[in-house]
A protein has these predicted regions:
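Gly/Ser/Thr-rich phosphate-binding loop
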Residues: 231-236, 245-307, 318, 325
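Conserved pre-ATP/AMP-binding loop-to-beta segment of ANL
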Residues: 15, 131-148, 155, 178-184
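AMP-binding/adenylate-forming catalytic core of the ANL superfamily
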Residues: 86, 341, 346-347, 354-357, ...
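Conserved AMP-binding/adenylate-forming core of the ANL superfamily
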Residues: 18-62, 66, 70, 87-92
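Structural core segment of the AMP-binding/adenylate-forming
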Residues: 42-47, 70, 74-137, 435-437
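Conserved AMP-binding/adenylation subdomain of ANL enzymes
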Residues: 167-184, 192-233, 247
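Conserved AMP-binding A3 loop
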Residues: 27-31, 144-168
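Conserved beta-loop-beta connector loops within the AMP-binding
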Residues: 289, 308, 320-338, 372-375, ...
Length: 488
């Protein structure tokens, strides 16, 4: 299977559960899923969607959301899911860049955002047609999904993932985790992230198993969902593990239940958190590493006794550690992580310069620093960029700084990540006012509230007469990071 269309053809021949709604228990077997997706493909075609178009989605986790993602790809278009926490400004930027043929969203959700300058034709998430033409199937190298990632330049970039990218990574992960028709994944992460789309949906479908789609993660309901739906695994981020640790003990019968293991990634897991979780619940947590540009996962720990906690596991595809001249470094040496393989993206949508910078000599430059130990396990050391990872959400300081600098009273702005016991990192902004202007935390937070998603907003603001600079006038963030790292 090399395309989403072929995956659905395969599942359309079986009567085993494929997708399950966590709240209602509604279950779609393979034949029903294939039929529902075909009905959504017809609705997209009737709305004018053609091969090569984009289909934007602003839909919460649901069977409808998962079906529409599959339908857009099956129609030969690229699905473009939108972060539900974005503001109208952020959504407008995506719509202007992606130029989707349709936006699949409920009217009330779009109205809640406010005016959108680039809103295309709206299509209801309930749109399904029982009859009508179906388009030719897509090719493996057609773009199936465009995921917008926070950009280091201050604007989100669309990573183009092909059918081959998605299916090869899904199959590789399923094989590595030894998933089969009896396995079931509980999907509580949002379906606008690669983790939920790939690990939470495509991996179980490609293995012949099923996915339970929950509207969102709620720590207080997690173990009850495990008891009700009997999943064998679930994807998490470290913040979710911390929230589960903060809940009262579940009944003994629910403490592990059907779970073989949990999967985690998106941010490093503190060793103390990992050990505390496994001791309390008796569920192994399998760490991995990846990024949107490599579809989902590039490494995973083994699921047996060879796993190495505090590492990100071993490569699933070719991975190197290189120096600044692209020379391979020996085991134990720290350098940039670069990747190659069928999981590496096609490129950034309409951004050839950004694509060329990220893809050099056939290798994806991740911007992350790491080392491979003598046994081939990857250890993340830091980030070459200044990326902040807040509860699994990527936040780039440049975007926040540009928003802050647009405030009429702000002369200088610098954003760094500050340690946080729940989210891993949060945003801390350092500001210098314009001459004669007054700045206070409340007015700056109000400014950010209408311009940035909640996870991007600073949780602490420090106003200084001037920000630290070097001899050439370059802003120095090291002293600010030191301040952020020592806060109580």
């Amino acid at each position: 299977m090399e395309t989403v269309h072929e995956l659905l053809e395969s599942r359309g021949r079986d009567g085993a559960p494929a997708l399950i709604d966590a709240a209602s228990g509604e279950t779609l077997v393979g034949t029903a899923l294939a039929a529902r997706v075909a009905g959504r493909v017809r609705a997209l075609v009737a709305a004018g969607v053609r091969s090569g178009d984009r289909v934007a989605l602003l839909v919460p986790n649901s069977l409808a959301c998962a079906e529409t993602l599959l339908a857009a790809a099956t129609a030969g278009a690229a699905a473009v899911p939108i972060n539900l926490r974005w503001t109208a400004t952020e959504v407008d930027h995506l719509l202007a860049d992606a130029e989707p043929r349709v936006l699949v969203a409920a009217d009330e959700r779009v109205r809640a955002l406010g005016p959108l300058a680039h809103c295309p034709l709206l299509l209801s998430p309930d749109a399904v047609l029982a009859s009508g033409p179906l388009p030719p199937p897509p090719a493996p190298d057609d773009t199936a999904l465009i995921l917008y990632t926070s950009g280091t330049t201050g604007h989100a970039k669309g990573a183009m993932l092909t059918h081959r990218n998605l299916l090869s990574n899904a199959r590789r992960i399923a094989d590595w985790l030894r998933l089969g028709p009896r396995d079931r994944v509980l999907t509580t992460m949002p379906l606008f992230h690669a983790n939920a789309i790939v690990i939470g949906t495509l991996v179980p479908l490609s293995a012949g198993g099923s996915a339970v789609i929950a509207e969102r993660f709620r720590a207080a309901e997690f173990w009850a969902s495990v008891d009700r739906h009997r999943p064998t695994t679930a994807g998490t981020v470290p913040t979710m593990l911390a929230l589960l640790l903060g809940e009262p003990d579940p009944p003994a019968a629910l403490a592990r239940g059907s779970l073989r293991f949990l999967l985690t990634g998106s941010a490093p897991v503190p060793a103390d958190l990992l050990n505390a979780f496994e001791r309390r619940f008796g569920v192994p947590v399998i760490e991995g590493y990846g990024l949107t540009e490599c579809t989902c996962r590039a490494t995973f720990n083994p699921i047996d006794g060879r796993r190495r906690p505090a590492s990100c596991g071993v490569p699933l595809e070719p991975l190197r550690i290189v120096d600044g001249e692209d020379r391979d470094l020996p085991a134990g040496a720290v350098g940039e992580i670069v990747l190659r393989g069928a999981h590496v993206m096609r490129g950034y949508f309409r951004a050839p310069e950004a694509t060329a910078a990220a893809m050099r000599g056939g290798w994806l430059r991740t911007g992350d620093l790491g080392r491979l130990d003598a046994d081939g396990f990857l250890h993340i050391v830091g980030r070459a960029s200044e990326l902040i990872i807040r509860g699994g959400e990527n936040v780039y300081p440049r975007e926040i700084e540009e928003t802050l600098l647009a405030h009429p009273a702000v002369a200088e702005a610098a954003v760094v990540g500050a340690p946080d016991p729940l989210y891993g990192e949060v945003v801390w902004a350092f500001l210098a006012p314009r001459p004669g202007a007054r700045l206070d935390e409340g007015q700056v937070l109000a400014w950010c509230a209408t311009r940035l998603a909640d996870f991007k907003r600073p949780v602490r603001i420090t106003v200084m007469p001037g920000l630290p600079k070097g001899p050439t006038g370059k802003l120095l963030k090291a002293p600010l990071r030191a301040l952020a790292g020592t806060r109580p």
